[in-house]
């Protein structure tokens, strides 16, 4: 529902192209969009029913601004600028950096080759990124052996170790001609761009010559270099007839999600690929999200632009090319078209996979919870609450509540209760008293605060706990929540549910669940979780009470001093280990600190 302020602004919208900026209650830009007609597009957010991520966006909008431009192309360019500036939450967001290394030929008087994770705009040469760090290291090592540049810090006044190994041109002790570097760099670039035939020929000739000169170690080194090329470079599948550095983008949309696939072609080979999945804010214009992704993709710190970008039809190639500064094309036939379709198929495959995994997850969560409700003959409910009690021969009795929503634990909703009733022995009457107290406290509070009740209560126990819970709900609170008990067998293993409502004249019945079903697994998981939560809380409570009792026995230590020690140290062991000075830092006087040390 649009506010009066927004309604008034909607009446003033022009029929022009431009960008709109949606803002939240704090004035922060949470979404940037563009349109050929601002009036129609912006009004659509508030004048029609929204679903999914777009509905979430609309709920947060408290204001908006517009910027008009003269053409759709200008609005696209402006949108990219605004997204970079504001990084809005509801626009496609990309993490910075790729984490993959590049091979760099540095832009220096005495250049060197090295691995780097950072791309600097210094006009150096960058090749990559390489998804396999070890392959990148091996390639760099090969280059440094075959076409050495500078490997030392330079200008040392004496030859470095690498010079003696033939892996440095000698900048360490002499001036190396620029032409010598240029010659090596041309060969390195040719190799990294996929032209390896000449390299293999040169290495074969050197290996043959070394063998003829009886330099067998050197011949073996050339042999290993040839082997590296054959195993690491040549084994990569050639998927293009030219060596143009090319990135291929395509996308697939389903169920308000977009899947984007990126292929990186280097040296006529598919170097690597990336997949990104995002929920769409504007499902009517997925192309906008796709183009925004590409622009942000190359705006990241460690991205090197290729020579060419391929995109599907329906994209404003001219505007995108202006943003990127490289050619953007849509092939109509041939090998490039096939690669573009391959990217689309892979994008679809990834999104289908995501939905299948979600479906499998739902079977284990929401589907499992439905099995429990079906077994009890109840309509599906989203929320299950479960109780368990814990005490040691009646000492420090506590109860714990866990909540499962659609088959998943909702730990923010867990609650712990210190029971106030006096318990002398662990028997049936104690369980009844504990159950009645915690159920009364829990649901009387929900009634008082007008909060939503659960759809099912599962008691960790049998008829005793179920009867006590139902008696409080029906006869004291007048609340109609289904209650079932999780019953264990003689081996303390969950066996079945017990369900019915004696307050309504229904007999409690045993309800079996298939031990191999997801519903049975969820029931045991709930039982284990509430038991764990209750036991953990009881141990802490018991330890704290035992510590308090021990401190109460020390003469001169009253409730205030005891609480100071509990807050500072938390355990009897730590208090014992504390020095006089540390005890005084906790707020005790010197005589009190000395008394504590002597008493413990």
Curated annotation (Swiss-Prot):
It comes from Lactobacillus gasseri (strain ATCC 33323 / DSM 20243 / BCRC 14619 / CIP 102991 / JCM 1131 / KCTC 3163 / NCIMB 11718 / NCTC 13722 / AM63). Residues 197-232 form the UVR domain. The keyword Cytoplasm applies. Pfam families: GIY-YIG, HHH_5, UVR, UvrC_RNaseH, UvrC_RNaseH_dom. Interacts with UvrB in an incision complex. Belongs to the UvrC family. It is found in: Cytoplasm. PANTHER family: UVRABC SYSTEM PROTEIN C (PTHR30562:SF1), UVRC/OXIDOREDUCTASE (PTHR30562). Residues 15-92 form the GIY-YIG domain. The gene is uvrC. This is UvrABC system protein C. One of its GO terms (molecular function) is excinuclease ABC activity. Signal peptide: none annotated. GO terms for cellular component: cytoplasm; excinuclease repair complex. CDD domains: GIY-YIG_UvrC_Cho.
